[in-house]
């Protein structure tokens, strides 16, 4: 998942992103390390926040806006 890359591009900490998504810093950390997968609702929130498609977020495409 491209979550860490997108977060760093916005110069955000895990905690600040967690607060924006109404989740915990631990959840963001687990998503970034692949130890936990976000549910569909959370995937949509993340994709909308970064203005990218879910396919881009999940590395299924290199086009950030595809199928958005």
Predicted regions mapped to residue ranges:
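Short basic helix-loop element that most often maps to the first helix and adjoining turn
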Residues: 2-20
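Conserved hydrophobic/aromatic packing and binding residues within compact polymer-binding modules
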Residues: 3, 17-18, 28-31, 57
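Helix-turn-helix DNA-binding elements, focusing on the entry/boundary residues of the two helices
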Residues: 3, 14, 25, 40-43
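Short, charged recognition helix plus adjacent turn
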Residues: 9, 58-68
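DNA major-groove recognition helix of helix-turn-helix/homeodomain DNA-binding modules
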Residues: 22, 41-56
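Recognition helix of helix-turn-helix/homeodomain-like DNA-binding domains
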Residues: 22-37
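DNA major-groove recognition helix of helix-turn-helix
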Residues: 32, 50, 58-61
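Short, basic-rich loop-to-helix N-cap that marks the start of a DNA-contacting helix
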Residues: 35-45, 66
